[in-house]
Amino acid sequence: MAGDGGRSGPSTPSTSVITKTKPRTKRPNLYRVLILNDDYTPMEFVVHVLEKFFQMDVEAATKVMLHVHHHGIGECGVFTYEIAETKVTQVMDFARKHQHPLQCVMEKK
């Protein structure tokens, strides 16, 4: 037969290997939200902030507040970047609205 390269008979099926690769997802970086001590913000206000923005109960909020008072800084929680940034902004705006100099920052864990 012309055009078949001189072969006759059925064509042989080709085989191929298909490999499935699972996409690897990278875990997002985590950030610590920290409250800084100052000499002017009342302890009760700090406890209120911890309850309101970090869903702490009174005991946990008081424990964190006392740690901030004695050590100058305390961790409120660990979050992804967007959540940490939002919480810092909320705390700073709330403190400013109530005329307190409370400072809240975030740092990469």
From Swiss-Prot:
Q: In UniProt terms, what function does this protein have?
A: Involved in the modulation of the specificity of the ClpAP-mediated ATP-dependent protein degradation.
Which organism was this protein described from? Rhodopseudomonas palustris (strain ATCC BAA-98 / CGA009)
Q: What family, per the record?
A: Belongs to the ClpS family.
The identity of this protein, by name, is: ATP-dependent Clp protease adapter protein ClpS 2
Annotated stretches, region: Disordered: 1-24
PANTHER family reported in the protein's UniProt record: ATP-DEPENDENT CLP PROTEASE ADAPTER PROTEIN CLPS, ATP-DEPENDENT CLP PROTEASE ADAPTER PROTEIN CLPS1, CHLOROPLASTIC
How it assembles, according to the record, is: Binds to the N-terminal domain of the chaperone ClpA.
Give the source's domain of life in one word.
Bacteria
- GO terms classed as biological process: protein catabolic process; proteolysis
Q: What is the lineage of its organism?
A: Bacteria, Pseudomonadati, Pseudomonadota, Alphaproteobacteria, Hyphomicrobiales
